[in-house]
A protein has these predicted regions:
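Short, charged, intrinsically disordered terminal tails
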Residues: 3, 223-231
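Residue-level signature of catalytic and energy-coupling elements of molecular machines
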Residues: 26, 87, 132, 214
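Flexible, glycine/charged-enriched surface loops at secondary-structure junctions
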Residues: 38-42, 199-211
Length: 231
């Protein structure tokens, strides 16, 4: 408990919630408060100028970042026939139809990504209460409902990052590790920002990206100047 209190005190001394920092300054803060036990993830939060209450303004997507997170990704694929063979050949960890659905219902497996062929969505659609809360429900916008299951598996395994807005209109996504250099984080963040800009809803009004914050797994949320993320 004393270590936690010490770290909290350290964070309060380092971060003024009213200030906006450059990327370099933010990375210095994360380095000072990083855990000695593991390499913490670095997440980005974008406050968007959207109305999250309107379904056509929710933003979600996927991107393969310039610098991979180096995480081992476990993939489950709902498919049969040729698509199932393609999935197995591409290295999917779990492939099936009703049998795979039963494994999810019984919580027998834990995966990072779920992919489905279009035909298999009739089965996946019954798993909304199981996959939805975990953010695993396949969606065409993220390339996880597709006829090109092999390509989708390859993208997932290569470290493709998925992002989406929450109920408050804030978009979340992981862009690296605390051990990454500032230039690596900048390149990943810039790629994320460009992808999010492409997905701006046609009905969104006013400024689109209102503010940006970075946070580490164990560290603080730090407001960052969007200009410092642009290459």
């Amino acid at each position: 408990m004393s270590k936690l209190t010490k770290k909290k005190k350290q964070l309060l001394e380092l971060v003024n919630p009213e200030n906006t920092y450059s990327l370099e300054e933010a990375m210095n803060i994360f380095q000072k408060v990083k855990s000695n036990n593991f390499d913490e993830s670095l997440d980005i939060a974008l406050r968007l100028g959207i109305d999250p209450g309107k379904s056509d303004q929710n933003v979600r997507g996927a991107i393969t970042l310039p610098h991979s997170l180096g995480k081992t990704v476990t993939v489950a694929v709902f498919a049969d026939g040729d698509h199932a063979k393609e999935a197995n050949d591409a290295g999917a960890d779990f492939v099936g139809m009703e049998d795979l659905a039963d494994k999810f219902k019984k919580e027998e497996i834990d995966v990072d990504v779920v992919i489905s062929s279009q035909a298999a969505m009739k089965i996946v659609g019954q798993l909304g209460q199981v996959l939805g809360p975990k953010g695993l429900m396949p969606n065409p916008k993220t390339g996880t409902v597709t006829e090109k299951v092999g390509e989708a598996i390859s993208n997932a395994k290569s470290g493709q990052v998925r992002f989406r807005t929450d109920k408050n209109g804030i978009l979340h996504g992981c862009i690296g590790k605390v051990s990454f250099s500032s230039s690596q984080i900048q390149e990943n963040a810039a790629a994320m920002l460009e992808e999010v800009k492409k997905l701006k809803p046609a009905t969104a009004k006013g400024a689109y990206i209102r503010s940006v914050a970075l946070s580490s797994t164990m560290g603080p949320g730090v407001k960052v100047s969007p200009a410092s993320l642009v290459i």
